[in-house]
UniProtKB/Swiss-Prot annotation:
HAMAP family noted in UniProt: RNase_PH
An annotated GO BP: rRNA catabolic process
Source organism of the structure: Francisella tularensis subsp. mediasiatica (strain FSC147)
CDD domains for the chain: RNase_PH_bact (cd11362)
Keywords: Nucleotidyltransferase, RNA-binding, rRNA processing, Transferase, tRNA processing, tRNA-binding
Designated name of the protein: Ribonuclease PH
Gene3D superfamilies the record matches: GHMP Kinase, N-terminal domain
Entry-linked PANTHER family: EXOSOME COMPLEX COMPONENT, EXOSOME COMPLEX COMPONENT RRP41
Role played: Phosphorolytic 3'-5' exoribonuclease that plays an important role in tRNA 3'-end maturation. Removes nucleotide residues following the 3'-CCA terminus of tRNAs; can also add nucleotides to the ends of RNA molecules by using nucleoside diphosphates as substrates, but this may not be physiologically important. Probably plays a role in initiation of 16S rRNA degradation (leading to ribosome degradation) during starvation.
Length: 235
């Protein structure tokens, strides 16, 4: 039995609020159960130096957690003067996943900057961030079209992207781990896929006990099922 009482293949309650903030070109509040993340997509003229005069745009991501998004307050990374390795890893994951969904040539020499701010954490913050940010990007691209930054016929969005966590908890593969499960799981895996059914990234780690190829296949099957439900629900 899972702590939440959910079935092994059951997602948490999923809710999306578009236009959650006033100023960003695209903004979404995404909620997976008690995990809540604000995802914004800001359009900035120009590109980094390594993209200058390439005719292509760029997409990059930042990720952070509010001090009391977790059970115990933690100091802001800005106050510590250094990002943690975890934060840097998650930022790179979000950026990689989302760049796979956008035709950077089609947005011209503009940069889409993603900000994912966790306001409440209960497991799965990185996967919620990816899913919410993909929705925010779609809204930002629509904003660009409506405001003459892109031709209305342009289609920079190659696909949508969603992500979910799976794992082995009490020797059973489970979908969409909350904090209680994640902190006690024998295996934790994050799966990122696009709306075309393609796999973008898989991160899987055994926690003190290895997992078999059969267990991997079961977890991947759960992830595919969950992501399909996410696309059907919020995209």
């Amino acid at each position: 039995m899972r702590p939440s009482g959910r079935n092994n293949d059951q997602l948490r309650n999923l809710k999306v609020t578009h236009n959650f903030t006033k100023h960003a070109e695209g903004s979404v509040l995404i909620e997976f159960g008690d995990t809540k993340v604000i995802c914004t997509a800001s359009v900035v003229a120009g590109v980094p130096k390594f993209k200058k005069d390439s005719g292509e745009g760029w997409l990059t991501a930042e990720y952070g957690m509010l001090p009391r998004s977790t059970h115990m307050r933690m100091d802001r990374e800005a106050a510590r003067g250094k990002q943690s390795g975890r934060t840097q890893e998650i930022q790179r994951l979000i950026g990689r996943a989302l760049r796979a969904s956008v035709d950077l040539t089609a947005i011209g020499e503009n940069t889409i900057k993603i900000d994912c701010d966790v306001i409440q954490a209960d497991g799965g913050t990185r996967t919620a961030s990816i899913t919410g940010a993909s929705l925010a990007i779609a809204d930002a691209i629509e904003y660009m079209k409506q405001n003459g930054m892109l031709d209305e016929q342009a289609n920079p969005l190659l696909s949508q992207v969603a992500a979910i966590s799976v794992g082995i908890y009490n020797n059973e593969p489970v979908l969409d781990l909350d904090y209680d499960e994640d902190s006690n799981a024998e295996t934790d895996m994050n799966v990122v896929m696009n709306s075309n059914g393609g796999i973008i990234e898989i991160q899987g780690t055994a926690e003190g006990k290895d997992f078999s190829e059969e267990e991997f296949a079961k977890m991947l099957g759960l992830a595919k099922k969950g992501i399909k439900e996410i696309f059907a629900t919020v995209f």
